[in-house]
């Protein structure tokens, strides 16, 4: 029993360094050069005195640990669908969001509004309002009955004197 050196049980409840179950690899009393631990290097083989031959598989498993990169990103995998719900972003939207200078239209105004006004999560900018001083007479957070929120420039224009 001195070959087991503190290991619990015999056979199927032992695992290798990657968490894979290791079958009983001990023959009679003699072992191959490996110190009697049953695990050699990657791709090595272990044969006991009983004539058993067990190859060690070369599988790379992480054992349930997720390895993450050191970089961080604040991009979300979903966005406002305009109807009070959320929808998943496609890969094109995710890529466009990460590219510098390539943000045109709604994504650009949404980021500008979120970054400069401290808006709430999921707040959506308004794309397509052009013209200066056209005004609709509404001084709240929405334009008419469309449910679309004001853009950053419209908020600034509203605060300027003589534009009403």
UniProtKB/Swiss-Prot annotation:
Keyword ATP-binding among UniProt keywords: no
GO cellular component terms, semicolon-separated: cytosol
InterPro entries for the chain: Dehydrin, Dehydrin_CS
Region listing for Disordered, in residue ranges: 42-164
Keyword DNA damage on entry: no
Top-rank taxon: Eukaryota
Annotated Pfam families: Dehydrin
Biased composition (Low complexity): 105-115
PANTHER family listed in its UniProt record: DEHYDRIN RAB16B, DEHYDRIN XERO 2-RELATED
Name the UniProt record assigns to this protein: Dehydrin Rab16C
Organism, as annotated: Oryza sativa subsp. indica
């Amino acid at each position: 029993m001195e070959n087991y050196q503190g290991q619990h049980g015999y056979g199927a409840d032992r695992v290798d360094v990657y968490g894979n179950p290791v079958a009983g690899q001990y023959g009679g009393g003699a072992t191959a050069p490996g110190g009697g631990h049953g695990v050699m290097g990657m791709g090595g083989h272990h044969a006991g005195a009983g004539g058993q031959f067990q190859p060690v598989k070369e599988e790379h498993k992480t054992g349930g640990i997720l390895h993450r990169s050191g970089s961080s990103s604040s991009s979300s995998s979903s966005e406002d669908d305009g109807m009070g719900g959320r929808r998943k972003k496609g890969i094109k939207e995710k890529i466009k969001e990460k590219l510098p200078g390539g943000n045109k239209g709604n994504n650009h105004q949404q980021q500008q509004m979120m970054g400069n006004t401290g808006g709430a999560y999921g707040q959506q900018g308004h794309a397509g309002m052009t013209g200066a001083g056209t005004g609709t007479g509404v001084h709240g957070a929405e334009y008419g009955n469309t449910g679309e929120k004001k853009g950053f420039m419209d908020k600034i224009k509203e605060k300027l004197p003589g534009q009403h």
